[in-house]
Regions:
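Extracellular jelly-roll beta-sandwich "head" domains, especially the C-terminal globular C1q domain
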Residues: 4-146
């Protein structure tokens, strides 16, 4: 037999965000970094807000977060990609290839403070990177774990 059902707890993973760019956007990459806009297929749960330019995702609550991204561009470039938190590079998310490529990705679990602002960037080369339309050009997933 089973005991009485307990009180329903809160779901930490109800704090999430998903957004991508399927528009083939041409991004003017600067050496210091250019945020990638993610205006398409947004599914933003409570606890995360997105900026008007669809480039900054701000978390309301401190915690451990799963963050993953993928970027696909139409022509090989010797460009790099990363996640930034409040404008600073997040260690473990930098993809800096030695040879020109068209695909970039990283996944991390990291601790964020309330109010931290997350962005996806291309950086390290003065170039125009055109996001793919045959595969998602750019994808960002954020999930609060604890």
């Amino acid at each position: 037999s089973t005991g009485p059902t307990g009180v329903t707890g809160t779901s930490i993973t109800a704090t999430y965000a998903f957004a991508n760019n399927t528009s083939g956007t041409a991004i003017s990459v600067l050496l210091g970094g250019t945020n990638v806009p993610l205006p398409n297929n947004q599914n933003i749960g409570p606890g995360i807000t997105v900026s008007g330019g669809n480039t900054v995702f701000t978390v309301a609550n401190a915690g451990n977060y799963y963050i993953a991204y993928t970027i696909n561009i139409t022509a090989s470039l010797l460009v790099s990609s990363r996640i930034t938190i409040n404008g600073a590079q997040l260690a473990g998310t930098v993809n800096a290839p030695a040879l020109a490529t068209t695909s970039f990705s990283a996944t991390i679990i990291t601790t964020l403070a309330a109010g931290d602002a997350i962005s996806l960037q291309l950086f390290g080369l003065l170039a125009v990177a055109t996001l793919s339309t045959t595969t998602p050009g750019a994808v960002l997933t954020i999930i609060r774990l604890s």
